[in-house]
């Protein structure tokens, strides 16, 4: 449901609705402190909870996947360079200090505007998300 009336007032036709309703989602199982989590990211998503509950893990994974998606679209990185030699975990997740959070039972499904990333059985699969149009190049800010 769309609740931002200022945005609604600026919509000229139904095709403008698409970019507002498209939603980025993140499903996480057995990663760090998270046993199971499903998050739908809206224009502004705020995490509030106890220390050690996994808020930072979610924020770091979201930041990582949006960065990867943007890099793939701009051709600054390739799908092969991300999935080869388990670089997703060993390089990109390690950059966010998440490498030790993964186990053989870890599962992540990130559905972005242009790409779907699925991490399962210690392997990352990347595929195009054909259901969406242009990328909304959002700014991501992680504040611990």
List each language-model region with its residue ranges.
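P-loop NTPase switch/coupling surface
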Residues: 1-144
């Amino acid at each position: 449901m769309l609740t931002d009336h200022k945005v609604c007032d600026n919509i000229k036709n139904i095709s403008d609705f698409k970019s507002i309703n498209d939603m980025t989602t993140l499903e996480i199982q057995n990663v760090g402190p998270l046993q199971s989590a499903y998050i739908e990211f809206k224009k502004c998503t705020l995490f509030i909870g106890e220390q050690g509950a996994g808020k930072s893990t979610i924020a770091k994974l979201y930041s990582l996947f949006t960065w990867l998606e943007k890099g793939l679209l701009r051709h600054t990185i390739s799908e092969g360079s991300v999935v080869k030699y388990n670089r997703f975990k060993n390089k990109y997740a390690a950059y966010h200090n998440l490498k030790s959070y993964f186990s053989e039972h870890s599962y992540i499904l990130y559905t972005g505007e242009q790409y779907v990333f699925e991490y399962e059985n210690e392997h990352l699969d990347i595929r195009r998300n054909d259901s969406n149009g242009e990328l909304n190049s959002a700014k991501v800010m992680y504040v611990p």
